[in-house]
Amino acid sequence: AYRWFLRMGLTEKVPDASTLSQNRLRRFNDSEVFQQIFDHIVGQALANGMANGRVLYTDSTHLKADANPRKAVNELRPEGVSEYLEQLNAAVEADRKKHEKKPLPAVKNKPESEAAVKNTKVSTTDPESGFMHRDNKPQGFFYLDHRTVDGKHGIIVDTHVTPGNVHDSQPYIGRLERQIQRFGLEPVAAGVDAGYVTAAVCHLTQEMGVALVPGYRRPNKGQNVYQKKHFTYDPERDVYTCPAERLLTYGTTDRNGYRHYRSDARVCVECPLRDNCTKNKKGEKTLTRHVWEEAKEKANALRLTKWGKKIYARRKETVERSFADAKQHHGHRYARFRGLMKV
């Protein structure tokens, strides 16, 4: 069968096994041939109606790195920079201008030795893997496979590997843009789990004309009885109203894209609900609202519609099934090689 596949005659000499393996290991290093083959297969699926790119489902799964979790060192590594920093900076400046605030001073480009760093656990066996520490997930060195499948028949249209300590939302927009540009897709909806629900992802998907249908995540309960959900936002006046019918007015917009709304401490001191509202020593209540919070609210509202529920329900039949098949039948639980490129 392999002679027929390789178009070899019955008497021709078969290449040695090492010839094939070394070709795979050396010849195509630093090339995009594997990506090109993958893209060609996806193109064939689209051309033959097996996929249509109308609804895309994205999720990530962890692959255990070939690395002993006990063989690790702590290193000071540069802090990760958001993939959406440029768009966020523009939105922050526009919002401050709208509220007649001075522009924020430009961030100075510090030399590498003075850049912001954080203490990071690094494997001595596979330094390119990432130490994963998530709720209800195993702890150790892992890689993440960020996968997107088509909603029609579950055809994989994109896969992207990162270290295990990369947040799901970071590569999402870049990968979605690549799929749209590479294959000419026109998606109307994208189904994702709660890990992708950030203000940036919600805003940028809506800017692309894609309806984001997210999962639900129970918010962390703070120390106060009255949470943010008990305060009502008025977009016309740009104020929050507290349970005691008092106003929290706009103060400023910080570099991270959050507007700060503060109450009048003189009013809060005499409020009978104060003990359930804030523990601030000044008697002042502060709420934050992202400049792209409206997009996040729209995504959550869409999740509750009949159409949104129907779209989200198919995640388990598409991307979750794809991961289950990969793990159960194709050894996708463990990374057989070391290093990001080989994984």
Regions found by a protein language model. Give the residues of each.
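Anion-binding and metal-coordination hotspots
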Residues: 7-343
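DNA-recognition alpha helix
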Residues: 1-5
